């Protein structure tokens, strides 16, 4: 199964990386590697995260450190919708999808 990263999720990852890199480039690289590793894991185990049907039917959420990966598994791919810090409000998650 392949992993598809949506444009909003790409923006999220870019913003996270830029924010962390200002403080610690090494920490930013380490976290981005964790995200990549988790995306590869989702390609093999797409049902790994917790169901978040309260957001969208079929939506799942996986935690990495203090970040939440919101994704939806499909028959042939896993679509990453957003990556948010756990302190961020997720109520507007669908506003730009």
What are these regions (language model features)?
Residues 2-59:
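Basic, Lys/Arg-enriched alpha-helical interface segments
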Residues 22-25, 61, 81-83, 90:
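Short, low-complexity, polar/charged sequence segments that are solvent-exposed and flexible
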Residues 58-61, 69:
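A beta-hairpin/wing motif
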Residues 67, 72-97:
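Enriched for short, Lys/Arg-rich terminal
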């Amino acid at each position: 199964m392949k992993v598809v990263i949506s444009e909003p999720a790409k923006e999220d990852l870019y913003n996270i990386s830029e924010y962390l890199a200002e403080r610690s480039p090494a920490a930013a690289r380490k976290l981005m590697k964790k995200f990549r590793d988790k995306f590869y894991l989702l390609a093999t185990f797409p049902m790994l995260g917790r169901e978040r049907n309260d957001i969208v039917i079929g939506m799942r959420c996986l935690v990495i450190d203090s970040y939440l990966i919101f994704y939806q598994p499909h028959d042939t791919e896993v679509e990453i919708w957003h990556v948010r810090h756990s302190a961020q409000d997720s109520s507007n998650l669908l506003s730009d999808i």
